[in-house]
């Protein structure tokens, strides 16, 4: 072959290579440009590993969407700073019972999801529990529940029966003491641990969460009195924890962890707490079967639990990638996504089709979840909670009725500016 033909051929080959390389580079660049990144802000840090797996599954099904998960310490404070500075993540795990969520929804920070088809994937229209001005801004995928943990093995040994009514609960405590056992493990230094029990007491006495808040939050200032029938019945229920001999030794100085360790080490046969406590109890490797029961009502079948949305998702109203953000939220409302979550977390799942462990210690509470016996925390309509926790523990330590009434009035009075 003549040299100029060789040069011509080499030139064609070289040009072809350059064109192919440029074409491939262009395709790669175009592919990269086509891929959309959305940010998911997570507050369930203990579930990071599981959520990463779920996100990978989503990305596999949606190769043009990349989900960047943000999970930081003190997530609530970080989120507040970002929202108030206008830097709202595309998809946010935010607790819909919190006042921040409600105020930010009213202020237009979140996308209105009212009427979206994926809301039908939730049990009993659960998203409606957290409507703000009759609009849905949150998709609550899981919830927590609260009740009474008990030593199932010891109950069987001693012939003790799980109470179905309040009177049976009182009788049970007396039977436990008669058998030289301690009824309750309590955390006197951390009032939030008794929040569930006290709220369940008030809901049970008044008949509903709305009625309880009507008495506490939406009544006239200084209207809570020791002579009130409601407060008297509430104190009867608090006294079941407060009466001498009903708690483990040194309970007044006990922390949350101390109370769970006391229960796990069989220093007490019961402890009031929420679903979040189960992993911590199991970490103590108790040598007995753990059980739970709902807060007993006045009649059989009236047991109740209280809790709220836990893994709950909102979308920024100003996201630049609404289509992709909604696609991710929709995916999270599927059983294939939430089955993986439930298998690790164990909390009640609002998504239809998730197979629940019928042998879970939480099953007696889980079966009430997302029904009319699963109330949302009363604090959904409060602007704070800490002083309520304090009023509860102060009463348990002193059994001072006037102190409880005064403490509740002092806590709720500043919120009542909107009460006619």
Curated annotation (Swiss-Prot):
The record's annotation in SUPFAM superfamilies points to: Periplasmic binding protein-like II (SSF53850)
Question: PROSITE patterns recorded for this chain?
Answer: PROKAR_LIPOPROTEIN (PS51257), SBP_BACTERIAL_1 (PS01037)
Q: Which Gene3D superfamilies match?
A: Periplasmic binding protein-like II
Reading the lineage from the top rank, the first entry is Bacteria
Keywords tagged on the record: Cell membrane, Lipoprotein, Membrane, Palmitate, Signal, Sugar transport, Transport
**Induction text:** By raffinose.
Q: Where is the lipid attached (S-diacylglycerol cysteine)?
A: 23
Where in or outside the cell it occurs: the entry states: Cell membrane
Question: Is Transmembrane helix among this UniProt entry's keywords?
Answer: no
Q: Which Pfam families match?
A: SBP_bac_1 (PF01547)
Q: Where is the lipid attached (N-palmitoyl cysteine)?
A: 23
Where is the signal peptide, in residue numbers?
1-22
Q: How does it sit in the membrane?
A: Lipid-anchor
* GO process terms (BP): transmembrane transport
Q: Name one GO cellular component term.
A: plasma membrane
Q: Which family does it belong to?
A: Belongs to the bacterial solute-binding protein 1 family.
This chain's function reads: Involved in a binding protein-dependent transport system responsible for the uptake of melibiose, raffinose and isomaltotriose.
The protein's name: Multiple sugar-binding protein
Originating organism: Streptococcus mutans serotype c (strain ATCC 700610 / UA159)
